Amino acid sequence: MDLDQWISKVKDGQHLLEDELQLLCEYVKEILIEESNVQPVNSPVTVCGDIHGQFHDLMKLFQTGGHVPETNYIFMGDFVDRGYNSLEVFTILLLLKARYPANITLLRGNHESRQLTQVYGFYDECQRKYGNANAWRYCTDVFDYLTLSAIIDGTVLCVHGGLSPDIRTIDQIRVIERNCEIPHEGPFCDLMWSDPEDIETWAVSPRGAGWLFGSRVTSEFNHINNLDLVCRAHQLVQEGLKYMFQDKGLVTVWSAPNYCYRCGNVASILSFNENMEREVKFFTETEENNQMRGPRTGVPYFL
């Protein structure tokens, strides 16, 4: 495995051969299996939200925040689906994980699932680019090994979706059995699917999975676990980054600019320096993103 050569190859827009991808997936699984459900990460580190197959915009993210290993990263899931280059996105992230395991942490998102990827594009993309479903199988097997959360310097919890009524302490995340498809309900499901809302406690989620959780729930969770902040992704934010609640105890980070090649949103990444001081870096879509606009995304003039 010549990882540096493979990284150059994928950055140049080429695909790994099917057996190279298989080798890479097997190699990264061995790294991921050692990680905790709450993976400890030291500052300085930069936290990123959803990427959703927007490969050229991911390259711009690295230009904006710095390249691995000079910059350490946590990616909070949803690498695949919706965008046209999920395969390239997931491949480059796996390569960086293989090459610099201590400098990049990959969390699972609700789209790192066999079920969702068969509906929202990743399965079809693999089928189209490799002529069969093997690449999809290798990648979705890796999904089951991805960790559920990361904790920066013991004070900032990063998770894809949000909180769960079944999780009061971080220790309850540590004991979840994660090596499986995302369940339809329960604590694992909630970490992937829940959203913050301007309410006090809990409400049913319109997504049909996870919960809506409010300000009191969030501040109690932070207090019990000695956290300053919960970082999460999972929801499009037009302005790229959004703090929630009066105490700003939660932040949503969104890292896919002009999402789905038509939403017109800005993207952001959130950096923590060695003193845990925060800096937000914003970026907009690439020229390649702008050219992706197919006829199906055009807004009819009579709307």
UniProtKB/Swiss-Prot annotation:
Catalysed reaction, written as an equation: O-phospho-L-seryl-[protein] + H2O = L-seryl-[protein] + phosphate; O-phospho-L-threonyl-[protein] + H2O = L-threonyl-[protein] + phosphate
Textual note on the cofactor: Binds 2 zinc ions per subunit.
Obligatory cofactor(s): Zn(2+)
Sequence positions that bind Zn(2+) 2: 78, 110, 160, 234
Main location: cytoplasm
Enzyme Commission (EC) number: 3.1.3.16
Enzyme class at the top of the EC tree: hydrolase
UniProt GO MF annotations: protein serine/threonine phosphatase activity; zinc ion binding
Active-site residues, Swiss-Prot/TrEMBL: 111 (proton donor)
InterPro entries per record: Calcineurin-like_PHP_ApaH, Metallo-depent_PP-like, PPA2-like, Ser/Thr-sp_prot-phosphatase
SUPFAM superfamilies: Metallo-dependent phosphatases
Disulfide bonds: none
Protein residues bound to Zn(2+) 1: 50, 52, 78
Subcellular location: Cytoplasm
Keyword annotations of the record: Cytoplasm, Hydrolase, Manganese, Metal-binding, Protein phosphatase, Zinc
Gene3D superfamilies tied to this protein: 3.60.21.10
GO CC annotation, single: cytoplasm
Stored PANTHER family: SERINE/THREONINE-PROTEIN PHOSPHATASE PP2A-RELATED
Quaternary structure, from the entry: Interacts with PHYA and PHYB, mostly when they are phosphorylated and in Pfr forms.
Protein name, entry field: Phytochrome-associated serine/threonine-protein phosphatase
Naturally occurring in which organism (per UniProt): Pisum sativum
Gene (name only): FYPP
